[in-house]
Amino acid sequence: MSVFRDDFLWGGACAANQFEGAWDVDGKGPSVPDMCTNGSHTSPKWVTTGIRPDRLYPSHEAIDFYHHYEEDIALFVEMGFKTFRTSINWTRIFPNGWETEPNENGLEFYDRVFDCCKKHGIEPLVTISHYELPYALVEKYNGWASRELIEFYMNYCKAIFERYKDKVKYWLTFNEINCGTMPMGAILETGTIKGFEGSTADVPDNKQERFQALHHQFVASAKAVKYAHDNYPQFKMGNMICFITSYPLTCDPADVIANQQKMQITNWFCSDVQVRGEYPSYMKRWFAENGITILQQPEDADILKEGTVDFYTFSYYMSNCITTHKDTEDVGGNIVAGKKNPYLKASDWGWQIDPIGLRYTLNEIYDRYHLPMMVVENGLGAYDVKSEDGKIHDSYRIDYLRRHIEQMAEAVKDGVDLMGYTPWGCIDLVSASTGEMAKRYGFIYVNKFDDGTGDLSREKKDSFYWYKKVIASNGEKLE
């Protein structure tokens, strides 16, 4: 008998800016990803202030879900999805971000997507803002550095809440909001890159600006949650974390403290604000020691307290180690890197594979908050190569997912209230961090390549058939 609840939400996850394409179709305006070129594991993508004809912008076509959504959702149905995590592209609804009236063409597109899901019994799980800030808001306001974005965001939320009130139950206010605590978050999350053009590796890091922008996102998220609770009691509201589990590299107490502080800043800070509705005490010292002063309005404390989430969602891909000792080996990671764990193997991109860490993470989060939880991103980015028979035999991906689902089951046995699982990139899409197609996550292979070529045809990988059995058995059949 399965340990997962009978109504467990098995599914998959994607993001509008990474798979929709149609970047300037039907009134859509440019978002930050539309100004980002392609890159690779070894060569960072660029941000440009205008579209340059000598550059390739992968989000412009991506995998063209915009024109393939019925075909793609049919494949999700065949796998047995109970839920599909996707996002709404802000600039499809408000092309510049500040308009007072929404773009009807954009609203109608998501009507069609959600109707298609609901027709087949798939519950949409919708991220309101997933790394696609309107670029016009960057140019005029320097992104979330300006408090004015709170009301623009609320206008956007009100439009989509009312439009999709009978089609969407589960909402996430921001994707991986804690990326704002990291330098890369200036591009991905807060849009505090006004006037910047160059490699993503060279984005200037202004901590004061970054954390002030994050505060504005906290307030916007809380206001959206409270507005939803007051006007649409059927909604379940969340806000998603990029959870980067880390361990002390050694048993040196200095390493233990260093790791505790890293976990606080990277993971618990944003989690505490969204769940407990206030800034944690440990951040006061950190802000003081880093010369950061968060400007708040008198009403902000009440707004944060009144806008706490209903459930907790996070991404989990890997873990790393933290140390105060020098001369230790670095490894790659999701948004941030860390130190090499000698007990773990790594992916093609250097991300350390740690299934047991997922069980540990689930327990740590649940013990802290006692909220229902969903793992809304998890997966293996890998180079998929077609075999002589023309198929993708991705046993490595199956092994990765199997081992993580096994540890999810152990966490449920531990008492964790786990409500769903949506592996990332259920269909191949553009990487947010590197801007490449070669880093593939999907159960479905898309014939699209880093040079922009490909006929966009879809093909089932071995993992497609495996995940179908997993869902049909509610997580019992993992072989």
Cite the ranges covered by each PLM segment.
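Active-site region of glycoside hydrolase catalytic domains
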Residues: 1-53, 77, 96-98, 107-479
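Active-site mouth loops of central-metabolism enzymes
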Residues: 54-68, 145-147
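Catalytic domains of carbohydrate-active enzymes, especially glycoside hydrolases
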Residues: 64, 68-89, 123, 306-312
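A short acidic, glycine/proline-enriched capping/turn motif at secondary-structure boundaries
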Residues: 82, 91-93, 131-133
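Glycine-rich, proline-tolerant flexible connector loops at the mouths of alpha/beta enzymes
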Residues: 88-102
